[in-house]
Amino acid sequence: MPQKYSTLKNNINMLGHFLGETISDAQGSDILDLIENIRVLSRDSRSGDEKAREKLLDTLSTISNENIIPVARAFSQFLNLTNIAEQYQTISRKHIDQVASDRSLEALFERLKAQNVPAEKVISTVEKLLIELVLTAHPTEVTRRSLLHKYVEINRCLSRLEHDDLTQSESTKLKRRLMQLIALAWHTNEIRTQRPTPVDEAKWGIAVIENSLWKAVPDFCRQLNLHLEKNFGVQHSVNLAPVKFSSWIGGDRDGNPFVTAETTRQVLIMNRWKAAELFLADIQVLSEELSVVHCTEEFRAKYGDHLEPYRVVVKNLRAKLVKTVAYYGEILENKPSTINTNDILTDDQQLWEPLYDCYQSLHQCGMRIIANGILLDCLRRIRCFGLSLSHLDIRQESLRHTKALSEITRYIGLGDYSQWMEDDKQAFLIRELSSRRPLLPRNWTPSLETQEILETCRVIAQQPEGVISCYIISMARTASDVLAVHLLLKEAGVTYYLPVVPLFETLDDLNASKEVMTQLFNVGWYRGVINNKQMVMIGYSDSAKDAGMMAASWAQYRAQEQLVNLCEKMGVELTLFHGRGGTIGRGGAPAHAALLSQPPRSLKNGLRVTEQGEMIRFKLGLPAVAVNSFDLYASAILEANLLPPPEPKESWRAIMNELSDSSCNIYRSVVRGDKDFVPYFRSATPEQELSKLPLGSRPSKRNPNGGVESLRAIPWIFAWMQNRLMLPAWLGASASIRQSIEKGNKETIEEMCKNWPFFSTRIGMLEMVFSKTDTWLSEHYDLNLVKKELWYLGQSLREQLQADIKTILSLSHEDELMSDLPWIAESIALRNIYTDPLNLLQVELLRRLRENPENPNPDVEQALMITITGIAAGMRNTG
């Protein structure tokens, strides 16, 4: 391991040693010896020792049901501790001093100056910078909140241990605390006993904001200001908010019957209660600090003549915030309200104006150093979080709106809306949107499904403008899908304009997105209400599941490119909303590389992107880590706008069209065309058992009785991740490249790798995926869990995988995967020693459970769940 990572290696060894001591104390030395023996055998097996591999298999297959849980837990917990150490490494002071990232804002500003980009252009681009991260509750965060708090505390201990001036006593005390935390984690059940409710998920999202983002946002703004002042002699305006947050948690009802209108209402109140509580804590600190006596005459005239004028203003705000916290607390506890709404804060401006006046007065009185302290941090938080804490997106599937309108049109005697032609639907919707009379009959009683749709729209109508950020239509296919939601909102009493966002998800829908938006922009009523602003969401998960990674990636690129060109032509300001997951099969990639691979001009109005599942913890879970993530996002957006990527050559486009078609055909010939694929998938992976894992609140299938096509993209990816074949992330992609090379296109493809960020990023993503696959482990799943007559399919897929790896290596002119990123290769190699036993244990556990499905052993079920979470920790990007 390189010298610069010696701190990481030492931390991993220390945490592993403490875990071993904990296990010995809790389970006895015999269990620890067994675990250590398995670890050594796994290490030797990875080194090619066949006898060690045979002994490893024999040892794991003969473990008693009683001992299998502590063994599984040991390897799972070590992988979690490794993740903590690796996450800390990114913010370690020693690491930052040694490794200056060329992807950072600081490096970008220096590069911009070196390339003589005008300072005015840089500053104006920074002023438009917007990073909007949308937190989602997708069921990929397998780590319980009870453990997350302990993991954060472990990280803090590692930070304190890094100080060189610690006394022996201080160092011993910190290490003892680490041992306590690891022991607490060991004695905590890592598997939830029941699925979280949407409200539980919302509490998890609120905790991320409270424990990390609340501090990270003003810290990042300070860091941005330092870079601007150092390089261009200016500072970012206090009025600007480069980072904002929205959430789907409590608003995303697509396929989740547990997210109701009442859920949304409750989550909105919870958010406001927590925001008031957090601002109250800030204001209390300000109240203690702002004992300053000098202020401007304007300030004194506005707020009165007081000895400590700022403290009086802040104390008034504190009194209102105390009542605001109490008011929303009573609502959450279903108590009758004792507080007048005139006495609470309901609008951001009520908090912003007096504090901004304090800020201005302090500046004008020569107290800039005071103004730019805690007060400035508070102002930044108002601009970012506001009194709603985060904006809430509403999401629902298009078919649900169609069914609701069909119910209405049938009742009023117009026939079945769902059976009408698209032109007729649009004509009806535009006529009703333009009409002053209501559409809904006064005495009509809708079905429960339609009632829920309408009640959700009424909840939206009750919110102040800006609290709900947008209404997203999943599986959007037509212009009428968008107009239908506008009509339902109008009928529910929404009087302000709420952006309605079509989400184009499948290959066909992405390809048709330009035509759909053209139709909408040509509707006079629509152009009149959108104020020349439009958001469109690009779906990564379902398009990749539908057509494979390569075809989906190209369809996403072309759709964005066409939408950018269309909106520029029509004079519409376009915001592209990226629905990415953490894995390659769901659009995931390192943030910086992913953004620089976007089409030119697609980021000029900022970035809006989902942060999903476990990626929220890895990228945003600690303040310093979140600041790093913001920095990477910001540098990539600014670089894309100031040093845009090249327009792809026509020859590159021709190759991509060919790769898209051939990769899609290869992918679908397996996933859809082979009659044995579904039974193979269900037996070769723990897909059926995954449904028992109490992860998120949302069911794993849209249709409980359906096949793979009804399976959501997340469990689809998760299942293949478990058996190390990782099929959705690569099937069809490299094979299509190989076919193109065989046709004589190698030189062009190598040129694309070198000069086109879109293509080189895809190749890099494939290389990362391939480095995590394992054909021997995948075969082991087949030989023990799959019927013999289906073995041919697994063998064929593994042969494809091996051929695909050779293709990628031939393009990179390397002998080994990830040779240009040796640390990642080493990290994967280290993890494999601990992940391999979990994979082998999982096979044994699945075999035992499937042999006796009517009477499953609870210990075996529990151990299986632990292997699933442990492998997820080992693979990092699970969904």
Curated annotation (Swiss-Prot):
Tell me the protein family, please: Belongs to the PEPCase type 1 family.
Q: Which GO terms describe its biological process?
A: carbon fixation; oxaloacetate metabolic process; tricarboxylic acid cycle
Q: What class of enzyme is it?
A: lyase
Q: Which residues act catalytically here?
A: H138, K545
Q: Which InterPro entries does the record associate with it?
A: PEP_COase, PEP_COase_bac/pln-type, PEP_COase_Lys_AS, PEPCASE_His_AS, Pyrv/PenolPyrv_kinase-like_dom
Organism, by scientific name, is Histophilus somni (strain 129Pt) (Haemophilus somnus)
MF terms from GO for this chain are: magnesium ion binding; phosphoenolpyruvate carboxylase activity
Looking up SUPFAM superfamilies in the UniProt record yields: Phosphoenolpyruvate/pyruvate domain
Function, in words: Forms oxaloacetate, a four-carbon dicarboxylic acid source for the tricarboxylic acid cycle.
The cofactors named for this UniProt entry are: Mg(2+)
Its EC number is 4.1.1.31
Keywords attached to this Swiss-Prot or TrEMBL record, sorted alphabetically, are: Carbon dioxide fixation, Lyase, Magnesium
Protein name, entry field:
Phosphoenolpyruvate carboxylase
Which chemical reaction does it catalyze? oxaloacetate + phosphate = phosphoenolpyruvate + hydrogencarbonate
